[in-house]
Amino acid sequence: MKAIINGKVITVTGQTYDKATVLIENGKIKAVGPDIPVPQDAEVIDATGCWVTPGLIDCHTHICNFSEPGTMPGLSDGNEMSGPIQAQIRALDAVYPDDYAIVPVREAGFTTVYSTPGSGNVIGGTGISIKLRGHTAREMAIAGSEQMKFAFGENPKRNYGNRKQMPMTRMGIAGILRETLFEAKNYSDALKAAETDPSKAPKPDFKLNALVPVVRGEMRCRMHAHRSDDILTAISIAEEFGLDYVIEHCTEGFKIKDFLNEKHVKCVVGPHLTSPSKLEIHNRTMDNPGILSKEPNITVCLTADTGSQTSVLPMTIGFFIRRGLSFEDAIKGVTINAAKVLQLEDRIGSLEPGKDADVAVFDGNPFDSMSLCRLVMIDGEVYKNTL
């Protein structure tokens, strides 16, 4: 048993305590509060003067599949660009547990990240949520957390337009995605019909089979879209096929905030500390997270997107706060909102009894560039402690 005592405890979903205890047993949070008795045999961690938060979550990264340094071709496994539809491939099969990014990101207070395929394809395959611990992909992965990657805009256009093959345009992206989802829906319907009449079973198709849970609404889609028109196209297609979706990046979301609010959109906003390398991100602004978070029906998460850059996401969030994002919405963006997007809110994202003992301790406000993460705990095991 472990007890983190005397810290300012930010539960996220409940009360913030100026001085409280987090009690941990068997990898789970047992109790949180100011008057928690500490057993005599507990390992005591004194967090006096520090802020205690849930382990942080970046729910859109390429950690472990675009491993670093990215200049080495042998470490780049995030885009299978041999064809625009790659629903059957899995980021899990490219998770590299010795990726350079793991240690700096973990030491910045992050305990869970979502590792997604890149956006070079219209359908890029499934991503996976991973804990930043373990020695194999299977140890790191959270079973059942797969979600399907779709991409709109410049990346698929550039990758396939240069080859003079579809999709060369935004029309082509929407068209090939609709066509594939149409085929997947028919395939899914045939599978259902075959449950009572085996003669109606479709010819096995590995790619379409991977999309069956998507068109049945059983697997969430992560829809890469920067420009406002691409965001609207993504939502239109999601509604046409009854998909459960999240908008990734949502760079021009501020332009259509009322529409996004009406649709109760979940979005993952970022990155911001990169060069404006594409026309579709030239309207990027650090006001965007604050603008979107003020809308009551929009769920906002915050991302650094890449690999080790996630280690400076807390500092970046400090810039968002300066531009209008509240602290409450900021901490939710890398804890409980991110957990909800990953559909893991029953396990991570807040300090509550019964949840995984993923904890970060900072020597000040986590989003102050002068603060340091002093302790990181994942499933009750300490991976960093400089208290």
Feature map (PLM): residue ranges:
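C-terminal cap of metal-dependent C-N hydrolases
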Residues: 5-11, 340, 352-387
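Divalent metal-coordination and catalytic microenvironments
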Residues: 7, 22, 27, 49, ...
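Histidine-rich, glycine-flanked metal-binding segment
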Residues: 9-53
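Metal-associated gating/positioning segment near the N- to mid-region
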Residues: 50-117, 128
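His/Asp/Glu-enriched, well-ordered alpha-helical/loop segment
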Residues: 68-69, 75-82, 86-88, 220, ...
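Active-site gating loops and adjacent loop-to-helix segments of metal-dependent hydrolytic enzymes
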Residues: 69-95, 136, 151-159, 201, ...
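Active-site core of metal-dependent hydrolases
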Residues: 74, 91, 188-285, 301, ...
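Metal-coordinating catalytic core of metallo-dependent amide/deamination hydrolases
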Residues: 129-236, 240, 274, 306-307
